[in-house]
């Protein structure tokens, strides 16, 4: 695709790009001549052959300003065309842009339009791909005009004929062939490209479209409708490319009384899909490269072009000598195949292979597609000049904004700047001599270099660049050696360590680039992580350890109990060696301080022999004039900013992180930078002073371990005994044993931690490293000194869940050493971790790429979209483990509606207020505020991009987000980066299973009164271990709810769903305390219980048919398990295994369906009591630690909006459940509401039903088990519900599985993009098509355009209007008034019907491909399909997103590239109006569609 048309220069300031199907005329207009020979260069002279594929006459000279024969040399002959060789004297660079062409002997079908799915040509001609192929490859004839002979034979246009049939007609009606080709009576049938071209020429698109629309409206057959819709889409795409020549002319004609003149269209004609001329791309894009030894490496395209030319020339010769039809036909077919291979060689099974190596040649399509294609390799990712890379080492003495740049690198990178300075200062006379100075490494150059780099920032980048902090700017400092030096605090942002990592250096050259690097990218301006708003420059490892060591307390240290007048005295005393670093001392200090309550215990530091002193100190402490602290903390306070309170507690990593966040928000980045540098220095210094190192003796195994292990072995033996006697099933035994060991592991883990804590007064080096957060986790400490515990089995379990837990734990720890068997079991996890890492990194990277592509054009485009919508944030949701707190979700958002305190009924916040950190903190403490409606990206009404108010504050700065901020890209980075990080982190666990003791006792989190809803209970008697009888209330109704209510206000504090089978420990109306037991649950299985006393009857429970007896190999005990009988039984009489509960007289009380995998716990005919267990359904408990390996596929599943593999059946209405009859293998579940609206759901038998007969369900409640499909939520509860569901579910994976904090607004940005489209259901009177996916805003615009218009049903005596067309109501009214005056028949009309649509949830891949911009979509995936579709439609790309602009080489329309910033006018006349954005630019921005400067691309 080239842009130069004829000789006109390329327009550089274009604002949009249009793509269309190239007509033969446009190919010829771009061509500089016809390529006639297949030769490339002469083998003797190595000069291009004339008229060949490299011809200088066509493509331009190979040497600058020199013609082929050498008659004209030098630039003075510029533009002259040599009379001898015909070559234009010009720069050789034109060989990159000049095109040629090949005139084909017969028309050839373009493979893209024929092989695309659905086939464009097939859709227009209503032919299947098979049929088309037979015509195109010269197997059958197709009738183009039946003429007289055809009519006699009963042939119609488009009928296919074999060779025999064709020649039979030709011979039978010989005279007919003498008629003129245009004669309607002449019989014409052709094959190949000619036939297709002739058929396409005869197509009338308008009447085809009308006919297809008629079929859509009138046809009864669904299949016919679907086919018509498929064809109509292609027809309408072609029609869309036909723009009327001028809107004004059209308007003028519409109501004039003269007949309209015929329209002149400039659009894609269907026959353009068949080519008579093919373009030859410029030779520099398919070069011949000389290798040593006189051989040449050639681009594959040259081979492909050569085949086309050879076959074309041979065909021309054969036509000239009038060769037999058979030979001609074969040659034409070969030409078609050669052109197919040139355009797309990868689609065909028999692709053209290269001669020497057996690989397929790279065709034009292949050079666009994929990672190595033109888009991704050359346009989106370019190599950069002025860059270098080297290994990094730590630079502990650097300031935060500095980095160390090796001198040798610096002189190379800044060479042009240095040369200029050397010449200016007179060190060198010319550039050449300056270069020599540099090569000689003359001492003079170093001073010059120092001056040059002063104030010239450089950018450092570490691959993989997962988020924007992967590239930061620094002020370079020249260093000796060859390694870059990096500040230790920026390592977290780069995810760098110093084990051999390399980093790249880039130099911003222009003044603007340097400014942006200084202002926006300097490392000291990027202290906060954009993904969560938390600081990223946090001390780690040695620094944390140093600061932790510094602030620790040691009892009995030298100088403890001393009282100092001020902090300066403390420092002097320490320097003089009078007090130790960790001594507990008292200092007179009356400013604010941040301390824990344990400082009163410091009074012990004063000996008991001095009671007066003790008493006085205590009084002073209570009066807050004296402060109990340590020497180290005073030293730390010396580096603190003055306005921050004294930190009087031990600083571990978490406290340090919070402190840094506090400092940044209070004193700003400049002061914070100094503070961070000081903390770094102090940390390293103290880590050195402390001399911390760990030895073998520091890992202390707790004494109590043996006792706990003994106990656990006893318990597990007891469980095995119970299992042997048949009291437990295999599954229950497994789960119970796992629980026992999990408990012991946790206890031993705590014990070992406490042992370390007590050792040496908490100064055990291993403990300090763990406790400070410098290195290692509690889990690793457990493995070192406790016990390794249970290990996960890496392969999939029986139930298909990843990784079960091996029930024999590893009892040893790494300090004691493992036995051979234990070591072997351990290797499992370690190896799995390493293999996972390499596999999952690619997945996470691909997820990031899709996220970027879907969100790349979400930019902040306006200040306020004016919507009143928003989303609700409720307080009670925060109780779920790992969820973000209520006030954290509000921080940095704007309020949508007034916030009212439900207790005092006062307005706390007004609509439009920003919730700052302080306000969020107030809301957290104000219990009266339970529900806040905030503005959200999900409900933003901006036409393009989003508005600043809906987005809230920029997390990285804490201020309102600026116009032009590329929030979509930031969102994609924020979600993608942790995904990659987490997958890289799985193997640190070493496969040790953690977590997962199933919750068996549920306790109250609040104090209050209980209120039961829908809870039905029965009393059940059980016997405990001693044989004593116990009575329990057992819940026998699903979906029962227990509320904890504040008795004073009546407000519900907590709402909990009580599971079926729960053992209640409380009654309705009870007062409960915080922590009191509410109910117990069986964690490993769900029971099926008898509701009343009675007798049991088994129905359809037959041995070997619906259940099998599984005897355990070890115990021989038999379990009865319901099996999947549907797959085996084909007899009609089996319905479904169920247990009936009868009275003693045989009357039915209840019937319980028993699902597959359930274990029977009762006997046929036995008497049971209310609450007895009839059967148990085991839960698949595969409890394994937080490892995002399970999480990443879940995130992908949610972002791709895939339906889960085993979806739940969901109720669509509120109503009461009843069970219907059984059909085949399905059971009917009916839900009926108060308005007699009934829905029937068919549930496969054996799937566990969660509701009982008579239960009340709400719309959206699941009826069966399984995951709820997001599509169902969208259908039943609407877009808002599904948006919230997706955001919450993705957050769950990140927070609970991985402990990563991502702000909701990033997820909202992506989810918004997934719901941007609607699907047209009924097109009404618009030009839309049913089933079309279009943008919400476009859909609204289309409907608003036909408002106030009417559709003419009968035109009466009016002339210039069409029936069925739309016109403005006033115009028709005016026309009717005129007609009434003249007593003519009036126009009858009806109002225009708007289109209707439904919201669609698209996965991120399809959403990215559905983008408005074809350039962006083509560079993402399915390049050829996207380009084909766009070309047919004649699409225009307005270059609104980021990606399109990068591809065409313009500044991106975000950040400083926004139109409003680029058209600033700077003037100095009067300082007050020194700059003003032009008003026009502000309004129209980059997004206004401009009429001028369009570039056309032809396929």
From Swiss-Prot:
- Please tell me which top-level EC class this enzyme sits in: transferase
Question: What gene name is listed for this protein?
Answer: rpoC
Name of the molecule in the record: DNA-directed RNA polymerase subunit beta'
Which terms does the record give in the GO molecular function aspect? DNA binding; DNA-directed RNA polymerase activity; magnesium ion binding; zinc ion binding
Species in which this protein is naturally found: Chloroherpeton thalassium (strain ATCC 35110 / GB-78)
List of residues binding Mg(2+):
497, 499, 501
The source's superkingdom equals Bacteria
The ranges of region (Disordered) come to 1475-1499
> Can you quote the record's cofactor note?
Binds 1 Mg(2+) ion per subunit. Binds 2 Zn(2+) ions per subunit.
């Amino acid at each position: 695709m080239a842009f130069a048309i004829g000789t006109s220069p390329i327009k550089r300031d274009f604002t949009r790009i249009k793509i269309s199907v190239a007509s033969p005329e446009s190919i010829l207009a771009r061509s500089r001549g016809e390529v006639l020979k297949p030769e490339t260069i002469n083998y003797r002279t190595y000069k291009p052959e004339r008229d060949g594929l490299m011809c200088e006459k066509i493509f331009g000279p190979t040497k600058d300003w020199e013609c082929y024969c050498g008659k004209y040399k030098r630039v003075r002959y510029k533009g002259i065309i040599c009379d001898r060789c015909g070559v234009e004297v010009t720069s050789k660079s034109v060989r990159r842009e000049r095109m040629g062409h090949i005139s084909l002997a017969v028309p050839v079908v373009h493979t893209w339009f024929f092989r695309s799915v659905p086939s464009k040509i097939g859709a227009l001609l209503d032919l299947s791909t098979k049929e088309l192929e037979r015509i195109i490859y010269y197997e059958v004839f197709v009738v183009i005009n039946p003429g007289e002979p055809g009519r006699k034979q009963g042939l119609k246009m488009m009928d296919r004929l074999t060779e025999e049939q064709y020649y039979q007609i030709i011979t039978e009606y010989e005279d007919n062939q003498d008629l003129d080709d245009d004669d309607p009576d002449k019989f014409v049938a052709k094959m190949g490209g000619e036939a297709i071209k002739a058929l396409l020429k005869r197509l009338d698109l308008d009447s085809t479209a009308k006919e297809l629309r008629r079929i859509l409206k009138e046809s009864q057959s669904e299949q016919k409708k679907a086919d018509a819709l498929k064809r109509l889409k292609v027809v309408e795409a072609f029609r869309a490319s036909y723009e009327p020549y001028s809107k004004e002319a059209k308007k003028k004609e519409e109501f004039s009384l003269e007949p309209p003149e015929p329209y002149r269209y400039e659009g894609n004609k269907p026959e353009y899909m068949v080519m008579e001329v093919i373009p030859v791309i410029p030779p520099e894009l398919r070069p011949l490269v000389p290798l040593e030894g006189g051989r040449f490496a050639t681009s594959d395209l040259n081979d492909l072009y050569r085949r086309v030319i050879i076959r074309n020339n041979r065909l021309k010769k054969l036509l000239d000598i009038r060769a037999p039809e058979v030979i001609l036909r074969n040659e034409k077919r070969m030409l078609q195949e050669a052109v197919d291979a040139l355009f797309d060689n990868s689609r065909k099974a028999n692709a053209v292979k290269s001669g020497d190596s057996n690989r397929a040649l790279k065709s034009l399509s292949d050079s666009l597609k994929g990672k190595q294609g033109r888009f991704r390799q050359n346009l989106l990712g370019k190599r950069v000049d002025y860059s270098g890379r080297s290994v990094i080492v730590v630079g502990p003495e650097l300031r935060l904004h500095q980095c160390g740049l090796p001198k040798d690198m610096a002189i190379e990178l800044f060479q042009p700047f240095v040369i200029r300075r050397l010449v200016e200062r007179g060190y060198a006379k010319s550039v050449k001599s300056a270069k020599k100075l540099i090569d000689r490494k003359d001492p003079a150059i170093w001073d010059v270099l120092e001056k040059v780099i002063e104030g010239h920032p450089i950018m450092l980048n570490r691959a993989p660049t997962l988020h924007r902090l992967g590239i930061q700017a620094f002020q370079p400092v020249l260093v000796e050696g060859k390694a870059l030096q990096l500040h230790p605090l920026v390592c977290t942002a780069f995810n760098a360590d110093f084990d051999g990592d390399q980093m790249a250096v880039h130099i911003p050259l222009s003044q603007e680039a340097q400014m942006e690097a200084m202002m926006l990218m300097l490392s000291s301006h990027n202290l906060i992580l954009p993904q969560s708003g938390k600081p990223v420059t946090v001390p780690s490892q040695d620094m944390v350890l140093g600061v932790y060591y510094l602030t620790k307390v040691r009892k009995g240290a030298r100088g403890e109990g001393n009282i100092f007048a001020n902090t300066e005295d403390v420092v002097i005393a320490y320097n003089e060696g009078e007090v130790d670093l960790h001594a507990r001392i008292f200092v007179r200090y009356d400013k604010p301080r941040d301390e824990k309550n344990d400082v009163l215990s410091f009074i012990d530091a004063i000996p008991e022999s001095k009671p007066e002193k003790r008493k006085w100190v205590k009084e002073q402490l209570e009066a807050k004039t004296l402060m109990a602290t340590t020497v180290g903390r005073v030293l730390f306070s010396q580096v603190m900013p003055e306005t921050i309170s004294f930190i009087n507690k031990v600083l571990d990593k978490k406290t340090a992180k919070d402190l840094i966040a506090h400092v940044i928000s209070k004193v700003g980045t400049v002061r914070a930078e100094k503070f961070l540098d000081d903390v770094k220095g102090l940390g390293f210094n103290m880590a050195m002073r402390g001399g911390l190192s760990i030895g073998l003796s520091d890992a202390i195994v707790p004494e109590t371990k043996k006792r706990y292990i003994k106990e656990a072995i006893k318990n597990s033996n007891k469980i095995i005994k119970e299992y042997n006697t048949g009291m437990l099933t295999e599954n229950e035994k497994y789960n119970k044993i796992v629980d026992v060991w999990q408990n012991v592991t946790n206890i031993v883990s705590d014990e070992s931690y406490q042992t370390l804590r007590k050792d040496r007064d908490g100064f055990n080096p291993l403990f300090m490293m763990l406790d400070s957060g410098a290195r290692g986790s509690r889990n690793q400490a457990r493995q070192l000194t406790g016990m390794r515990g249970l290990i996960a089995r890496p392969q999939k379990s029986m139930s298909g869940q990843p990784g079960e837990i091996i029930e024999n734990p590893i009892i040893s720890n790494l300090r004691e050493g493992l036995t051979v068997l234990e070591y072997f079991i351990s290797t499992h996890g370690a190896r799995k971790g390493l293999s996972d890492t390499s596999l999952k990194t690619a997945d996470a990277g691909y997820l990031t790429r899709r996220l970027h592509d879907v969100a790349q054009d979400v930019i902040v485009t306006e200040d306020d979209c004016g919507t009143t919508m928003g989303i609700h944030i409720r307080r009670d949701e925060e109780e779920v483990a790992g969820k973000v707190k209520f006030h954290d979700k509000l921080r940095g958002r704007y309020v949508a509606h007034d916030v009212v305190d439900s207790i005092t009924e006062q307005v706390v916040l007004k609509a439009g207020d920003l919730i700052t950190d302080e306000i969020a903190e107030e809301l957290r403490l104000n219990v009266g505020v339970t529900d806040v409606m905030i503005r959200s990206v999900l409900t933003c009404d901006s036409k393009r991009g989003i508005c600043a108010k809906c987005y809230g504050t920029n997390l990285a700065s804490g201020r309102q987000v600026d116009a032009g901020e590329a929030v979509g890209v930031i969102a994609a980075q924020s979600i993608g980066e942790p995904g990659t990080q987490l997958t890289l982190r799985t193997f640190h666990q070493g496969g040790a299973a953690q977590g997962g003791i199933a919750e068996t006792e549920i306790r109250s989190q609040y104090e209050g009164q209980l209120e039961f809803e829908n809870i039905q209970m029965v009393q059940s008697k059980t016997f405990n271990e001693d044989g004593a009888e116990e009575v329990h209330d057992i819940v026998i109704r699903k979906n029962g709810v227990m509320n904890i209510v504040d008795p004073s206000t009546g407000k519900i504090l907590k709402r909990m769903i009580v599971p079926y089978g729960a053992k209640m420990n409380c009654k309705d109306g009870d007062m409960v305390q915080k922590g009191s037991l509410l109910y117990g649950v069986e964690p490993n299985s769900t029971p099926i219980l008898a509701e009343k006393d009675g007798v049991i009857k088994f129905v359809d429970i037959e041995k070997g048919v619906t259940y099998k007896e599984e005897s355990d190999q070890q115990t021989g005990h038999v379990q009865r398990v319901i099996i999947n009988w549907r797959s085996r039984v084909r007899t009609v009489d089996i319905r479904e295994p169920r247990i009936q509960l009868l009275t003693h007289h045989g009357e039915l009380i209840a019937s319980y369906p028993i699902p597959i995998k359930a274990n029977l716990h009762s006997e046929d005919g036995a008497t049971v009591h209310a609450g007895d267990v009839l059967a148990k359904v085991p839960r698949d408990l595969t409890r394994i630690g937080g490892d995002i390996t399970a999480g990443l596929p879940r995130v992908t599943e949610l972002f791709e909006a895939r339906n889960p593999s085993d979806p739940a059946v969901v109720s669509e209405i509120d109503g009461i459940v009843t069970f219907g009859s059984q059909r085949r293998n399905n059971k009917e579940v009916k839900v009926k509401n108060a308005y007699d609206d009934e829905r029937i759901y068919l549930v496969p038998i054996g799937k566990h039903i969660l509701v009982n007969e008579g239960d009340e369900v709400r719309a959206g409640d699941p009826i069966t088990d399984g995951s709820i499909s997001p599509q169902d939520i969208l259908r039943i509860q609407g877009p808002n519900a599904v948006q919230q569901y997706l955001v919450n579910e993705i957050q769950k994976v990140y927070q609970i599985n991985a402990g990563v904090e991502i702000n909701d607004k990033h997820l909202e940005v992506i989810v918004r993009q997934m719901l941007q489209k609607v699907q047209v259901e009924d097109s009404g009177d618009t030009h839309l098509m049913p089933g079309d996916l279009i943008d919400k805003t476009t859909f609204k615009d289309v409907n608003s355009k036909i408002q106030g218009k009417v559709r003419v049903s009968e035109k009466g005596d009016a002339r210039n209007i069409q029936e069925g067309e739309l016109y403005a109501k006033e115009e028709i009214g005016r026309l009717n008034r005129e007609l009434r005056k003249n007593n003519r028949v009036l126009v009858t009309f009806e109002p225009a019907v708007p289109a209707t649509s439904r919201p669609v949830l698209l996965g991120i891949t399809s959403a990215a491909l559905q983008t408005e911009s074809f350039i962006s979509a083509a560079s993402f995936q399915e390049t050829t399909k996207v380009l084909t579709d766009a070309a047919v439609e004649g699409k225009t790309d307005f270059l609104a997103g980021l990606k399109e602009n990068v591809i065409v080489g313009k500044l991106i329309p975000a950040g400083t590239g926004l139109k409003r910033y680029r058209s600033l006018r700077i003037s100095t006349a009067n300082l007050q109006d020194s700059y003003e954005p032009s008003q026009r630019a502000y309004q129209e921005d980059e997004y206004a569609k401009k009429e001028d400067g369009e570039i056309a691309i032809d396929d």
